[in-house]
């Protein structure tokens, strides 16, 4: 049939799930933040903490039968101490926040053509590569008082 695509191609799984699982497999990242990686920063979370979310993306080649996506993943790296009542003031640890940001960038720069499988849902994907879209940018975090650096990656991946 003319104009039909390969119907066996699966849509890639949620980029946030795959990117988080990838980060959990990178010791350069987990040596700094352990498993403190999610799509939002919980109040009073253990720190340091890596927050990531999908902010769009595109098909690598809209005319191809292969469903390969390029997902844009902004990330926030937090470190320090939460403030509390009384004299317990928040503490912004910019050194650890930038170390976490640089660890993510280093891991992404070194990674290519790997397979990721989530432990809880057995979701699988192939990550072809990461592109570093934004290098560490210091953010003055007024609301939390924590150290914060912002970075962004683009992840090229597909379902398997």
Residue ranges with predicted function:
Residues 35-46:
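Short acidic low-complexity segments
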Residues 1-33, 53-160:
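Charged, amphipathic alpha-helical segments and their flanking helix caps
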Residues 45-55:
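Charged, often glycine-rich, active-site loop that binds/positions anionic groups
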